Amino acid sequence: MNSFSTSAFGPVAFSLGLLLVLPAAFPAPVPPGEDSKDVAAPHRQPLTSSERIDKQIRYILDGISALRKETCNKSNMCESSKEALAENNLNLPKMAEKDGCFQSGFNEETCLVKIITGLLEFEVYLEYLQNRFESSEEQARAVQMSTKVLIQFLQKKAKNLDAITTPDPTTNASLLTKLQAQNQWLQDMTTHLILRSFKEFLQSSLRALRQM
């Protein structure tokens, strides 16, 4: 199995970035009798929920861009005309008109449910990526963990958690095994398609969330 190595976006720098973003999901305890605003840094307003979500998505997108760069530099996968062959074997989440995330027919709650459900569906594909970047393992791991934090942020924002569909663990395990059993070319193409689709999904999500 080939591995990718990152130069422009080093693993150490990416991991340090993760440490800066993840604490937002787990704020430091506030002493009894004190309000969190009272212990905030002077002259700095604490980030709102929407600002944290926006920042988290942009951080993940930076990580995806770094991994995609390595994928594209390694081979011609980003230019391949045979993408459809591999893409037909995947069921990557995509935005559709019925999801209420586009400007036409925008519906905040319907869209939010779609975003969370889509991110949950992407998790098995992000797990697959952990075995595709041996020399950039920390970057791939950071994207995966940051996505989990993003899901937590969004679940707190959602009003109808019952409408969110959670993927079946057994089905995910079977899918992961199937993806890992592909030949080398298909594994490389799958990696490219996952990163590209995840980037597009997050970009669409970011535009929609900025309307909420």
UniProtKB/Swiss-Prot annotation:
Tell me the disulfide pairings in this chain: C72-C78, C101-C111
- Where is it located? Secreted
What are the coiled-coil residue ranges?
none
**A cellular component term (GO) from this record?**
extracellular region
GO BP annotations of the record are: acute-phase response; cell surface receptor signaling pathway via JAK-STAT; cell surface receptor signaling pathway via STAT; cellular response to hydrogen peroxide; cellular response to lipopolysaccharide; cellular response to virus; cytokine-mediated signaling pathway; defense response to Gram-negative bacterium
Keyword Transmembrane helix included in the entry's annotation = no
Q: Where is the signal peptide?
A: 1-29
Q: Which domain of life is it from?
A: Eukaryota
Record-level Gene Ontology MF annotations: cytokine activity; growth factor activity; identical protein binding; interleukin-6 receptor binding
Keywords assigned by UniProt?
Acute phase, Cytokine, Disulfide bond, Glycoprotein, Growth factor, Phosphoprotein, Secreted, Signal
Free-text function comment from the UniProt entry: Cytokine with a wide variety of biological functions in immunity, tissue regeneration, and metabolism. Binds to IL6R, then the complex associates to the signaling subunit IL6ST/gp130 to trigger the intracellular IL6-signaling pathway. The interaction with the membrane-bound IL6R and IL6ST stimulates 'classic signaling', whereas the binding of IL6 and soluble IL6R to IL6ST stimulates 'trans-signaling'. Alternatively, 'cluster signaling' occurs when membrane-bound IL6:IL6R complexes on transmitter cells activate IL6ST receptors on neighboring receiver cells. IL6 is a potent inducer of the acute phase response. Rapid production of IL6 contributes to host defense during infection and tissue injury, but excessive IL6 synthesis is involved in disease pathology. In the innate immune response, is synthesized by myeloid cells, such as macrophages and dendritic cells, upon recognition of pathogens through toll-like receptors (TLRs) at the site of infection or tissue injury. In the adaptive immune response, is required for the differentiation of B cells into immunoglobulin-secreting cells.
Q: Give the record's subunit note.
A: Component of a hexamer of two molecules each of IL6, IL6R and IL6ST; first binds to IL6R to associate with the signaling subunit IL6ST. Interacts with IL6R (via the N-terminal ectodomain); this interaction may be affected by IL6R-binding with SORL1, hence decreasing IL6 cis signaling. Interacts with SORL1 (via the N-terminal ectodomain); this interaction leads to IL6 internalization and lysosomal degradation. May form a trimeric complex with the soluble SORL1 ectodomain and soluble IL6R receptor; this interaction might stabilize circulating IL6, hence promoting IL6 trans signaling.
Q: Which family does it belong to?
A: Belongs to the IL-6 superfamily.
Q: Which disease is it linked to?
A: Rheumatoid arthritis systemic juvenile: An inflammatory articular disorder with systemic onset beginning before the age of 16. It represents a subgroup of juvenile arthritis associated with severe extraarticular features and occasionally fatal complications. During active phases of the disorder, patients display a typical daily spiking fever, an evanescent macular rash, lymphadenopathy, hepatosplenomegaly, serositis, myalgia and arthritis.
Question: What protein name applies here?
Answer: Interleukin-6
Q: Which organism is the protein's source?
A: Homo sapiens
Identify the coding gene. IL6
